[in-house]
UniProtKB/Swiss-Prot annotation:
This is Lipoprotein signal peptidase. Its EC number is 3.4.23.36. Keywords: Aspartyl protease, Cell inner membrane, Cell membrane, Hydrolase, Membrane, Protease, Transmembrane, Transmembrane helix. It comes from Neisseria meningitidis serogroup C (strain 053442). It comes from the Bacteria. Belongs to the peptidase A8 family. GO terms for cellular component: plasma membrane. GO terms for molecular function: aspartic-type endopeptidase activity. Pathway: Protein modification; lipoprotein biosynthesis (signal peptide cleavage). The active site is at D122, D140. It is a multi-pass membrane protein. Pfam families: Peptidase_A8. GO terms for biological process: proteolysis. This protein specifically catalyzes the removal of signal peptides from prolipoproteins.
Length: 164
């Protein structure tokens, strides 16, 4: 098991880097912004802001009275545990392991928010004219990119039937 763990070090480092970058960025925003304050970075395209999300992506279940905090905590920990196990058992090729590590780091970054603040801290706001993409954070970005990598890994290796 120790050789398996040591050969996977780069994935644990990636997950930890995602958590650290996410938490540092949220600390910087929480230290610099008032709730709902917005600062334009790229005119008509990108702002930094501070908003709280008690739900999931796109504020899914945000207005449900609080139970969703525990649901998303359990879900994130369960998915992360499954992905850790999958990495350790070599159930993914390199691309999939990289994606899994990114998902783990992002999920645990948001878990930390839920435990400390009771909600997730979001601050990246992209928009065009009257269209706004929901505010999100670095952890969400790691989760999304990780999911794309995992899907690509699955598509590529489903075709050739082997892991690399």
């Amino acid at each position: 098991m120790s050789s398996s763990v040591s050969s996977k070090t780069r994935y644990w480092v990636l997950a930890l880097a995602a958590i650290v970058l996410d938490q540092w960025s949220k600390w910087a925003v929480l230290s610099s912004f008032q709730y709902r304050e917005r600062v334009n970075v790229i005119p008509s395209f990108f702002d930094l802001t501070l908003v709280y999300n008690p739900g999931a992506a796109f504020s899914f279940l945000a207005d449900q009275g609080g139970w969703q905090k525990y649901f998303f905590l359990v879900l994130a920990v369960a998915v992360s545990a499954y992905l850790v196990r999958a990495i350790l058992r070599d159930e993914f090729a390199t691309l999939g392991k990289t994606g899994a590590a990114m998902i783990i780091g992002g999920a645990l970054g948001n878990v930390i928010d839920r435990l400390i603040h009771g909600h997730v801290v979001d601050f990246l706001l992209f928009y065009w004219q009257n269209w706004f993409y929901p505010a999100f954070n670095i952890a969400d970005s790691f989760i999304c990119v990780g999911a794309v990598l995992a899907v690509l890994d699955n598509i590529v290796h489903r075709k050739d039937g082997k892991k690399t």
